[in-house]
Amino acid sequence: MKHVFLFGIFGWLLSFTLVAQTGIWQWSVPVHNFSTHPKNPESRAYLWIPGQCEQVKAILVAQHNMEEISILEDEASRQRLAELDVAQIWVCPSFNHGFDFTDGAWETLDGLLADLAEESGYKELSTAPLIAIGHSAAASWPYYLAAYKPERTLACISVSGQWPYHRDRWLCPDIWGERNINKIPCLETMGEYESAHTWSNEGLKERKEHPLLP
């Protein structure tokens, strides 16, 4: 059943269109940032829940970078998510761009989930599985969430993104230690003219080194 659910999620992402969009977000709360030096202390978390949803089964979570909002507000995307009882949370500005879990990233996310659960009345938001999505400079944060909280992470989506184990001083710091994201489904997208011809080699290398990565 989990695999069927995830197939629906990934199928939705690969087929979304930017032609028709809808910008309804029913609830929002200010974000209490637990970082020692938050870059965006004025961040706000916005929540969308399908109109006929009685109980949220999962949450698609995004921090604002560039393309995330276009994906989240796409009408066809939301129709498919509604069929799956998947909610959306969009945080703008981002609360912790790379999800540095050594600097309060999880505590911040956990807090806003609890606040939105209280505000909306959908109590399950505080415990529901999370599908993290990030684009470009924020493309690695889903993997960092998965590494820190694998028990809460249903899947990771990296748009124009990175491979999970790629490291960079600024965007993908080496803070995982012995953590891994084995058995957590991940989807990385890269355009044909967007370094795909070389970046695919890195993906093949990581799959070989981490055979339990779906």
Regions found by a protein language model. Name each.
Residues 64-66, 135, 142, 146-147, ...:
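Cell-envelope and extracellular/periplasmic
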Residues 7-17:
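Bacterial N-terminal signal peptides
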Residues 18-59, 104, 128-157, 163, ...:
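A domain-start/cap signature at the N-terminus of enzymes
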Residues 100-124:
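Alpha/beta-hydrolase active-site loop
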Residues 53-100, 165-166, 196:
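Short substrate-entry loop that stabilizes the transition state in hydrolases
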